[in-house]
Amino acid sequence: STDRGRTFTRYDGNPVLTSDRPDFRDPKVFYHDRTGRWIMVIAAGQAMEIHSSANLRSWRFESRFGEEYGAHGGAWECPDLFELPVEGEPGQTRWVMLCSLGVEDGSRVQYFVGDFDGRNFTPEDDPDEVKWMDFGRDHYATVTWSGAPDGRRIALGWMNNWAYANEVPSVTFRGSNTLPRELGLRRVGGELLLTSVPAREAEKLLGEPFAVPAFAVETEHN
């Protein structure tokens, strides 16, 4: 694309990267200023792989992360990797790795906090520690955007769960997008945790409050 993603011309040299690993999918690509290279983080079975490129066409494998960290169950997918400032600690930043996966109670998004040097992601968390991005059951496949006003990191997820996604009654769709969220990092009890609040632009959607008095739900309610 030469017009900031508004139109695309298919590249004749596709695919630019292949693998014999299972579930090799969901690439997230961003530019890493410190190394001057493009970084691709991509799901590969029960882990995430990191590749780098100078031109977006020729890719070099850099590292693999995840086999011995966090929760495992279904395939790891929908990776993301980004840098965030630490709230209340001027000049301090950390990198966050997002990972969506299916576990016993359905689909969830876990995250890891650490450092990234352009080749390796090094988590601060213990290998057996699991940090969930959301404790609700309907927030999955989260992706983030950079370039938002004021340097904010905006996240958007799929409001559904693979445990029942194919059985949710609907008309022409399965689930919907979540509200955009602004992400941050806050130290709580010495531990860095991911924070999220609705993006400030969502306030434009607010209207007058509407209250429904208490009532019993009967079988005829649909």
Predicted regions and their residues:
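Short glycine/acidic-enriched loop and turn motifs that connect beta-strands
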Residues: 46-47, 102-105, 162-163
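Residue-level detector of Asp-centered blade-edge/turn motifs that repeat once per structural unit
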Residues: 31-36, 83-91, 148-151
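Conserved Ser/Thr-centered positions that define the repeating blades of beta-propeller domains
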Residues: 1-2, 50-56
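Surface loop/turn signatures of beta-propeller and other carbohydrate-active proteins
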Residues: 5-31, 42, 60-83, 120-142, ...
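Loop/turn-rich, solvent-exposed surfaces of beta-rich toroidal or solenoidal domains
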Residues: 87-113
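A short loop-to-beta-strand structural motif that recurs across blades of beta-propeller domains
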Residues: 47-49, 110
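Beta-rich accessory regions
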Residues: 90, 110-222
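Hydrophobic beta-strand segments that make up the repeating blades of beta-propeller
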Residues: 38-42, 95-97, 155
